[in-house]
């Protein structure tokens, strides 16, 4: 958030936008949409070594309880409508992280007739995490970049 001004009497002044965005970055609840081997690396970020819980990131089982969707793995054409349906069930504001080469652009299976060439053709993607599969550190870095993106957005329309 960044403290804009600390006054002599011990209180802080800031804008409502920055306060709301600070609260949102500290309580992201991702929903897993694990489709292939990238999902295993996504599970590593929730394990003891990286422990996303300490930063307020708690995996939720329902799209109605989450505000971030992590699409990890190869998205087939038959799975694309289900991805869109789950995305539509998420409350606003919502963000999407595309994890891995297959989710980003089809990856190794790019020329297959049954593979969607990137989940950004189905849902709007905010952060792309490259790799095949990307490491847990790369996903964690992508989450940090999403937090930076949220801090830069204007929450209140003028």
UniProtKB/Swiss-Prot annotation:
Location in the cell: Cell inner membrane
Stored InterPro entries: NADH_UbQ_OxRdtase-like_20kDa, NADH_UQ_OxRdtase_20Kd_su
GO BP terms in the entry: aerobic respiration; electron transport coupled proton transport
Subunit and partners: NDH-1 is composed of 14 different subunits. Subunits NuoB, C, D, E, F, and G constitute the peripheral sector of the complex.
Details of cofactor binding: Binds 1 [4Fe-4S] cluster.
Keywords from the UniProt entry: 4Fe-4S, Cell inner membrane, Cell membrane, Iron, Iron-sulfur, Membrane, Metal-binding, NAD, Quinone, Translocase, Transport, Ubiquinone
Membrane-topology descriptor: Peripheral membrane protein
Domain of life: Bacteria
Reaction catalyzed: a quinone + NADH + 5 H(+)(in) = a quinol + NAD(+) + 4 H(+)(out)
Annotated protein name in UniProt: NADH-quinone oxidoreductase subunit B
First-listed, main subcellular location of the protein, grouped into a coarse class: membrane
Record's keyword annotation contains Lipid metabolism: no
Pfam family, one: Oxidored_q6
Function summary: NDH-1 shuttles electrons from NADH, via FMN and iron-sulfur (Fe-S) centers, to quinones in the respiratory chain. The immediate electron acceptor for the enzyme in this species is believed to be ubiquinone. Couples the redox reaction to proton translocation (for every two electrons transferred, four hydrogen ions are translocated across the cytoplasmic membrane), and thus conserves the redox energy in a proton gradient.
EC number: 7.1.1.-
Alphabetical list of NCBIfam families matching this protein: nuoB_fam, PRK06411.1
Cofactor(s) the protein requires to work: [4Fe-4S] cluster
Family: Belongs to the complex I 20 kDa subunit family.
Residues that coordinate or bind [4Fe-4S] cluster: 37-38, 102, 132
GO molecular function: 4 iron, 4 sulfur cluster binding; iron ion binding; NADH dehydrogenase (ubiquinone) activity; NADH:ubiquinone reductase (non-electrogenic) activity; quinone binding
GO CC annotation terms, alphabetical: plasma membrane; respiratory chain complex I
Lineage, top ranks: Bacteria, Pseudomonadati, Pseudomonadota, Gammaproteobacteria, Chromatiales
